[in-house]
């Protein structure tokens, strides 16, 4: 929050960023939604502003280390010799666990948490297919999967019991967060409703 309050330029990840996060921006700050920008435009704007002595805040959703697509941005800033700092955030994974009042690891249930996403526009190695990861029967936190929930459920049912408890959390930690609880057997229908 302190960086956002001082930043001259803020580039945020569109609808994924809670508007309350940006509410502390100083008057006169230049604010851009990166959803309408490509990577080259984003990194060029960041580098040019930083080189002009401006404080730049690149605001991602949750924690930038999980599906934040920051590797390319870091590489570009390094190549331009632009100093930067990565400030950790609260991942929607942990905000969801808090909203669910759930512990992700429980003795004799699961001591492992798998963080993944379904294959989509971003390719993914076959060895990381959800049905392959399901074989571990660990706690699974699946990002970006609600739009293909029936396919995700079908892959999970390869190894999980249909009565396995499941929750889908939308906009974790936001004022308008939504939680849908069910089992693997009925979650796809519950999400549709």
Tell where the protein language model's regions lie, with residue ranges.
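Structural motif
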Residues: 13-14, 35-36, 118-119, 143-147
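A contiguous loop/helix-start segment that scaffolds small-molecule binding in enzyme catalytic cores
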Residues: 51-56, 112, 120, 124-193
